[in-house]
Amino acid sequence: FESKISTSKYGMGCKMNSFKTPTGLHSVSSMLGRGLPAGTLFKNRRPTGKVIKKIPHSNSDYITSRILRLNGLEEGKNKGGDLDSYNRYIYIHGTPHYNTLGSRQSQGCIRMSDRDVIKLFDLVDQKTLVLID
């Protein structure tokens, strides 16, 4: 399974409030959105009831379709203190901004197309290992 993704426009890094995409070994800690329609918009990890069907004119960091929340597994790198991916709310999630996939545009999360994040969601489970390199 291959997919175009988008990572942080600020580069790679693990520090809290850096808005960078963390590196290293992670696991899927929670999975949200099972059974919801493609394009379902989330706010604070809850579905809003809205479904986004086309690319929005705004550059907002929309979280759509599915959320796979990541937990860092490397103490001192992406786990613990101000380097903790879980406490930074780092996700793999859907985006309606398909035109930005393949470039660095997120605020730290890993963005995928709605179709691809749904496919990935159906292939993995909690505790699945994720290496961000």
Task: Indicate residue ranges for each PLM-predicted region.
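Well-ordered beta-strand positions in beta-sheet-rich domains
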Residues: 2-4, 25, 129
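Surface loops and adjacent helix of pleckstrin homology
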Residues: 5, 31, 122
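Residues that form or immediately flank small-molecule/cofactor binding pockets and catalytic motifs
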Residues: 10, 33, 97
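Exported/periplasmic cell-wall-interacting domains
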Residues: 36-133
